[in-house]
Design a protein with these regions (language model features):
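Active-site acidic/histidine proton-transfer and metal-coordination neighborhood
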Residues: 78-163
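N-terminal pre-domain/capping segments
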Residues: 1-73, 78-97
Length: 163
């Protein structure tokens, strides 16, 4: 059995995926997770294919499999919240496109908080939003990350995520 071990690494405008691979290799990792921009805002740079291809070569040379790499969605999205719903769906569609451009098939997402809403309504928003995001037949799987359950966070248990 081969262990797959990694951590969060950076992804900056200059070195992009190549820099992420280099950082993971410095840690001795064979996988990693990253944000395609700062997790607290919507600023995203243009993905440069030539850097991505260099990253692929470095990954191949070091036995890092692309299917094990994960993008983490930014914290500013909240599919639960009616007021942030449209923004969140649109921004996550862009993140899915960025994943596809990088060849990455997994996007991790915090479901969000139900601020001022019934929990069932918030969960229905998550389901509706995910269906809208994934309706284009893309190859990216959205992975819901469990939450600590503090305050109005949704997704504190597997039962809640499997709603």
């Amino acid at each position: 059995m081969n262990l797959i071990i990694g951590s969060h690494v950076s992804f900056n405008r200059d070195t992009q995926l190549l820099g992420s691979v280099e950082e993971a290799l410095r840690y001795g990792s064979n996988t990693f997770m990253f944000y395609t921009g700062a997790p607290q805002n919507t600023k995203r740079g243009i993905i440069r294919d030539e850097i991505t291809y260099q990253a692929y070569k470095l990954m191949k040379d070091n036995d890092i499999k692309l299917e094990n790499i994960i993008v983490h969605a930014p914290y500013i999205v909240n599919l639960c919240n009616d007021e942030k719903f449209e923004f969140s769906v649109n921004f996550l569609k862009q993140e899915v496109e960025r994943c596809e451009q990088l060849g990455i098939t997994k996007l991790v997402l915090h479901p969000g908080s139900s601020v001022g809403l019934e929990r069932e309504h918030a969960i229905s928003n998550i389901i509706k939003g995910l269906n809208m995001i994934l309706s284009n037949g893309n190859q990216v799987t959205i992975c819901l990350e469990t939450m600590a359950g503090k305050g109005t966070e949704v997704g504190k248990s597997f039962e809640e995520l499997s709603y």
